[in-house]
Amino acid sequence: MMIKPRFRRRATPKSINTVFQPPGTISYVGEQRTEEVTTETILYNEHEFSQQEGILLDRLEDDQVNWYNIDGVHDINLLERVGDKFNIHPLLLEDIANTTQRPKTEFYPEGIYQCIKMISYDATHHELMDEQVSILLTQHAVLTFQEKTGDVFESIRERIANSRGRIRTSGNDYLFYALMDSIIDHYFVAIEQIGEYLNNLEDEIFDEPDKESLEKVQKNKRLLLTLRRAIYPLRESISRLLKEESPFMDNQIKSYLQDAYDHCIQIIETVESYREINAGLRDMYLSSVSHKMNQIMQVLTIMSSIFIPMTFLAGIYGMNFEHIPELTWEHGYRYFWIMCGIMFISLLGFFKWKKWL
């Protein structure tokens, strides 16, 4: 199944005021949407595999992994029906419907809830798009809730369909980890592309800095801040998964989660490194602009220094005194220009000798 790219600039969420609503009230908070919600059911074990559209709750069985994917959390009625089927806590459903959540992990009697930001980089416009993904691990199933159609899980679908790796022989908890790991892997893709952009921007600022260069530096600052806000809470979430015991997750999965935690640390270190590089680019830009201004001022100063003596001579012989001896010379005008030429050449040679030119 091919997934069409659908990442675009994220609009500012048009939030519903939920401040004075009772806890557990399910209200959609996020970008206004009118598209139809799409759902998908993937069922598999070591020997069988099926993938169909829709939520096939009648086929929920214990001897297989049941993955239910919902693209679109603005349909509150659908969320309530799914919540009734899996006995999902109302507070959890409230978090799923709120797409402005901070990445976090919560443990409920019904299962483990993971909120995570899915990141995509648009190289054409140099923008980061983030989308909230809610992953719920229960005793019998894994549920994923996304804001819209399309995701970074196609590699997992292919592994399941082609029985590659250990995913077909593992349980719901391994799928829970694999989904998180796929999202984290795409952080690396975004970071690598941002790193290449920083290298190109560094060359641009060094060769020919302009106003657009500073705007690009400021844009980089915002992108890296977006990554930082997504990855720091995720590190805390995985750390909590590693520390706390849960009947829904086997201890063997924690070795894989430790690897995901290490990846988060690596991403954080890279992001902080890029933030320092970006700050250095800003300083480089300001230094380059200052150096260019100094060069312009140097040229103007040298030109002024050369013409000041000539202006002095012209001022003397332009005075309105009646008796100025040189004014009566037959070749006085020629001598004036010869004198100006000598001063010009002398000052030019002096500046060259001082290496000011």
Task: Describe the role of every protein-language-model region.
Residues 1-243, 248-250, 256-259, 263-268, ...:
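Peripheral, non-transmembrane regulatory/ligand-interaction domains of membrane transport proteins
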Residues 2-8, 262-357:
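Hydrophobic alpha-helical transmembrane segments and their immediately adjacent juxtamembrane loops
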